């Protein structure tokens, strides 16, 4: 929906802006990338979720996806910048799938359903 300003669109723009700033201006890329979630969600009061930690975890996944990396596994600890060196090449094709659902952001709506209705459980965009 072009022209309609939503919180999800604003967050997406902030993530891409911060990733671009780090790519062009950073001297220490790994530390600056790890700090992006704290820049986008400052303070200790959550805006969209019940916990600031969950918001930052979701933002970390958005940062990875914005850099062309895949989502981190849920069952093991992995840094936001893990795999960045292998991904930092002149030409890189995306890693399938093209669209991904961030598991920590999902409120467990039914899988494989393409219709969004008033039965949604309150994602940021609704």
What role is predicted for each listed range?
Residues 2-126:
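Ferredoxin-type iron-sulfur electron-transfer modules and their immediate structural context
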């Amino acid at each position: 929906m072009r022209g309609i300003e939503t919180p999800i669109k604003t967050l997406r723009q902030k993530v891409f802006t911060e990733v671009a700033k780090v790519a062009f201006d950073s001297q220490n890329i790994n530390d600056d990338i790890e700090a992006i979630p704290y820049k986008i969600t400052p303070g200790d009061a959550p805006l969209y979720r019940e916990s600031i930690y969950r918001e930052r975890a979701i933002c970390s996944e958005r940062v990875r996806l914005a850099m062309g990396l895949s989502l981190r596994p849920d069952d093991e600890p992995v840094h936001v910048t893990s795999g960045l060196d292998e991904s930092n090449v002149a030409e890189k094709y995306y890693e399938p799938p093209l669209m991904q659902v961030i598991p920590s952001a999902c409120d467990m709506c039914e899988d494989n359903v393409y219709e969004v209705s008033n039965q949604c459980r309150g994602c940021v965009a609704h």
